[in-house]
């Protein structure tokens, strides 16, 4: 919505040409192309630029638009330089839950008044330019507030002061709402300005749902804007087309009043017939308009795709009819934020919406519905059907495994019965001690017999051992005799002839010596 306001406020043919090009791009891309693009799975860069270029205009403005805004801001600063520096800067409102309280605080407390006056808005720190300050009571086609008679918070009129371009950028960024150094720019603390009106947004939301007061006319009650939860930070500029603007008949400086196109769009959606989809309940609409997606199991994939296609087509037609019915509310005020308040021009009807913006929203909503439908069909085809096939395969595998388990169980039971009835009975009979024919009895008899034989054998072995010992002693003696005989035989073989008769020779010699000694001794004795 903020991007649409910037588009309407741009001058020249730059953004208008972009609007016409994007319009032609949307008209040249029917539903079949979008479906083919999503089914093919390839990103379409051109189509993406057609859909997403305009929503991003507010944050990615072109160089030409920024240059034009900067030139106009410099021109305005040169004209109102001295007057602007004498005034305080505008208070940055704080819309956090700490300042605006909760919905539950307002549900159990009575609201002060159904219609909040402009003085209450001044005490809360709101500017008449803010979309929430559009008073619910209209006098005529559109309220004409005197800006000079009702000064703002700082005690100055909107005619003598307009925030600079840098100040607008600071207000647009959400991070600047809670800075503690706002006082150095001459700004009031948001917590101080919202002390007396903490539940302002809650009352504003509840008042948008209540019927209008008796003093309001039918036209003015129909023109009351609904609660806008999204704050449009970009102020719309007047289009340069001569068909949408004309000077006021009285010629005096009219009040600078800004109605956001987003609030008007919400009002058109609320004032649409009951059969159309309400914008305040998107979850229920999604749940009612896509039964095939909510319950994909009850329908076949083809039926689910057809059902989602029919439901999204009906929702697209209803949104188109609601946006086309909004052309009856063809009155809007376009305000140039960089021009003095005295130079503001209004249309003859004072409330005429830009037809290009309405066409853009109609095409954008329809195209988004088509893309959502194609995305749902793509999800059904690529994810749900794939999951369904996997589920069928898993069920088949599960049945197969269950069958195998049953067969294995039956075989196990058969083995158990066979072991218990046949094998165990045979084992019990074989190991029965009382039965002489059993395996255990026969084995015991055999073992006892063999033990007796082994004992007899041991006795025989003992007697044999004794006899063997005696034989060993005899053999030892015989061996000693044999060894002596062998030594004698060896010595006989080793004796020579000299050694053999040496002893006899010695005996003879000794005998001769003895005889000689005896003869000598006898001779000596005989001679005496």
From Swiss-Prot:
Protein's membrane topology: Single-pass membrane protein
Residue ranges, compositional bias (Low complexity): 1-13, 283-296, 308-332
Region spans: Disordered: 1-52, 170-193, 230-257, 270-334
Keywords tagged on the record: Endoplasmic reticulum, Membrane, Phosphoprotein, Transmembrane, Transmembrane helix
GO cellular component term, pick one: endoplasmic reticulum membrane
Record field: compositional bias (Basic and acidic residues): 17-36
Gene Ontology process terms (BP): cellular response to alkaline pH; cellular response to salt stress; post-translational protein targeting to membrane, translocation
Modification after translation: Phosphorylated by CDC28.
Pfam family, one: Hph
Record's signal peptide: none
Coiled coil: none
Residue stretches spanning the membrane: 505-521
Source organism of the structure: Saccharomyces cerevisiae (strain ATCC 204508 / S288c)
Keyword Endoplasmic reticulum: yes
InterPro entries assigned to the protein according to its UniProt record, in alphabetical order: HPH_family
Oligomeric form and interacting partners: Interacts with HPH1/FRT1.
Role of this protein: Required for growth under high NaCl, alkaline pH and cell wall stress.
Protein's cellular compartments: Endoplasmic reticulum membrane
Protein name from the UniProt record: Protein HPH2
